[in-house]
């Protein structure tokens, strides 16, 4: 997708502060340091649309971004950062689950996984929420440039087994080389704008 406009809309914590449900949304989520900000920036063709926090796990806001005036990308807070304050860790679950349960224009969630790691309890909890609320997941494996082709294949199989999915459902991505950008966009558009056209 050619991104002409990518703009920050607003940050929110509670539903009353969310933007109006005027555009289809796709949300991005993953553990802290998984490469979520880098993925969104590459998709948007911007170097710093989403700023990477120097203190992972501290910012607990849902950030909304307008893409070309036709789609909203939503940056959900990262999870699993051990040094995050207890009150921050405690509020993460209810805030994210509330967003997933109540957001009527949410079309899909990009669940981002580090290809070098087996999915965490937080990853599995997130997948469980997506299944509960019937939200289509898009699985993206980041940091693929850090492994050899053989290692990537091995890790992809292990992760697919852990989340009980076909390995072909897992998309490979590298922020360094931008490999995988088009494949991620293709899946995002299939579940968002293509759905909107079917509704018309």
UniProtKB/Swiss-Prot annotation:
Pfam families attached to this UniProt entry: MMR_HSR1 (PF01926)
- Family matches, as InterPro entries: G_ENGB_dom (IPR030393), GTP-bd (IPR006073), GTP-bd_ribosome_bio_YsxC (IPR019987), P-loop_NTPase (IPR027417), Small_GTP-bd (IPR005225)
Chain residues that bind Mg(2+): 37, 59
Annotated binding of GTP, by residue: 30-37, 57-61, 75-78, 142-145, 173-175
PROSITE patterns from the UniProt entry: G_ENGB (PS51706)
List the GO molecular function terms: GTP binding; metal ion binding
Might you name a Gene Ontology BP term for this protein? division septum assembly
Q: Tell me which residues make up the EngB-type G domain.
A: 22-194
Give the disulfide map: none
Which Gene3D superfamilies did the record assign?
P-loop containing nucleotide triphosphate hydrolases (3.40.50.300)
Task: Kindly list the cofactors needed.
Answer: Mg(2+)
Summarize the protein's role: Necessary for normal cell division and for the maintenance of normal septation.
Task: Tell me which NCBIfam families the record gives.
Answer: GTPase_YsxC, small_GTP
Similarity annotation: Belongs to the TRAFAC class TrmE-Era-EngA-EngB-Septin-like GTPase superfamily. EngB GTPase family.
Q: Which HAMAP family match?
A: GTPase_EngB
The name on file for this protein is: Probable GTP-binding protein EngB
Q: Which organism is it from?
A: Pelobacter propionicus (strain DSM 2379 / NBRC 103807 / OttBd1)
Per UniProt, what is the name of the gene that codes for the protein in this document? Answer: engB
């Amino acid at each position: 997708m050619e991104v002409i406009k990518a703009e920050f809309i607003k940050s929110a914590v509670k539903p009353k502060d969310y933007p109006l449900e005027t555009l289809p949304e796709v949300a991005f989520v993953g553990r802290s340091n998984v490469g979520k900000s880098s993925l969104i920036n590459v998709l948007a063709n911007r170097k710093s649309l989403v700023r990477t926090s120097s203190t992972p796990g501290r910012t607990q806001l849902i950030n909304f971004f307008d893409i070309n005036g036709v789609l909203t990308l939503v940056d959900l807070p990262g999870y699993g950062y051990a040094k995050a304050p207890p009150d921050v860790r405690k509020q993460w679950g209810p805030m994210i689950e509330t967003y997933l349960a109540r957001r009527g224009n949410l079309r899909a969630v990009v669940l981002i996984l580090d290809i070098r790691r087996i999915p965490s309890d937080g990853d599995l909890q997130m997948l469980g929420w997506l299944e509960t609320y019937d939200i289509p997941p898009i699985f993206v494996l980041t940091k693929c440039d850090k492994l050899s082709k053989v290692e990537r294949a091995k890790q992809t199989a292990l992760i697919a087994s852990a989340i009980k999915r076909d390995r072909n459902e897992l998309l490979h991505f590298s922020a360094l080389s931008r490999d995988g950008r088009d494949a991620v966009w293709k899946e995002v558009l299939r579940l968002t704008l293509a759905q909107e056209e079917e509704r018309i």
